[in-house]
Amino acid sequence: MSRALRLLPALLLACSSSGPTPTTPAPPPPAAAPAATPAPVPKASPVAAVPEASVPVPEASPAVAPRGPIELTFVGDIIFGRYRGDNTFDPIPGPDDHPFADIADTMRSDLLVGNLETPLTYDLPLKSPIGAQFRFGASKQMAAHLVDGGFTALSLANNHAFDLRAQGMIDSPVILRELGLVPLGAARTEAPLFRVETIERSGWKVGFLAVTARRNAPHFDGTPELPFASTNDFDALLSPVIAAARAQHDLIIVFVHWGEEYADDPAPHQRRAAKALLDHGADLVVGHHPHVLQGIERHGRGAVAYSLGNFLFENTNDIPRLTGVLRARFTAERCLETLTFHPAYIKRTPSKHPVPATGGMGKQVRARMTELSAPLATSFELQGENLTLGSFPCTPATAL
């Protein structure tokens, strides 16, 4: 049963409403930020959607067998500032700040993915171009912090994509590519709307499907369109895309912007949708939008993390500042071996930034994740400061 959190001050009401075959990817991200900009990661290759409503899950048969295990890490919502009530922009990191430096070791893995809850542009306007209460934006210079943080890819499919109007939707994926990062779920004018982007790393082909069930503006003809769908339509619209991409990838990860803000629990229709996506071939479903942590649920050979909460965000009040880094380790046979949740929180000084949660703060983060996962029939093992899930079945759908 959903238990709504007490809404905090005004800020807690925040969001309302491809190409050719990839080249050799960059080496893993550096040990700490700031760091030199790594070599560009490969461009993602889209896989077109198919019209069938139901497609059997085929055996995966990649062209190149994986050379060993792979680790993927995921974080929640990231912004670099917002427009205040007087319509002036208030940045989060200062010009000399390195917002991901304190948590770089925790985030380090083969692939690092987050939700970029802000559009990007080359010339950030002094005044917001829209009239909403909560308006985000960032320049290319601000987005360079993502490179220092070791990110591989960022999802753009969320309900702040229109905060800088159509120009921000156009500039965002271009800027990410210029920085050597892979945009996921970017708004586009050409079909297919829902597509799997392929990232190759260390002999693995990992497919990412990013979609949003929330948006802050309707689509107008001739303008870029977000990969938007109602959660109730996920099975019909997304499951065929996943099933079609399954044979071309070692792993399929679904990154989804959904749910209710500040809710403790996912809604029943979210749970049904997530399980359908896993049944059709997804290995993980990773959610965001509620701005708070929600529970993790096992299903078959995979799992769903309903919300990873905020990560780099201005809201440092009570529950919304609790966050974490989710690490998934897959064996060479393409089976989920362990899922580890590293507790973290948003520190207020010297500027807002995520740090590992240890001691009393770590207990607070772990308690929330444990409590909210229990009704989902999930129990963790405590390993140091972290929560771990293991013993996932390895079925023929993912075995080599």
Which residues are covered by each model-predicted region?
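Sec-dependent signal peptide recognition
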Residues: 2-10
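C-terminal motif of bacterial Sec signal peptides marking the signal peptidase cleavage site
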Residues: 12-14
